[in-house]
Amino acid sequence: MPKKQDNIVNSLAHTKWNCKYHIVFAPKYRRKIFCEEKRLAIRDILRTICGWKGVEIIEGEVCPDHVHLLLSIPPKMSVSYFVGYLKGKSSLMMFQRFGNMKFAYRNREFWCKGYYVDTVGKNTTAIKEYIANQLERDKEMDQLVLFDPKDPFMGSK
């Protein structure tokens, strides 16, 4: 399979553009909800919504407690508008698909209020690799056993 160029320039009527963003957001209370069926569902929902708005998903990873996306968003659309739309619509679609979630999330608020966004310039390949390996890194961190030291004020016995 030929390697896709990282610096492809897109175009609108009178505009040439290459706008890529690394976006990270998490479910409310940072719950580890994205396992098996819900992981596949949110992946399909995010793809669908991005397709509706003409946003290209370059790379994406759904971790148990957050989502990483590398997106190419047209300049006619603000990042904050799109992320708000994406989180709002995906929330409604998740509650529609999984009715029992209403007990875990009050007021149908599925996502945390904020998100992380970073512009991606010439380092698209590095960001793609980071996102692709994010799930493995999270699993490694979950498997670490932390040393529980004794209380330093109790003395040694």
Model regions: which residues?
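Basic nucleic-acid-binding interfaces
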Residues: M1-K157
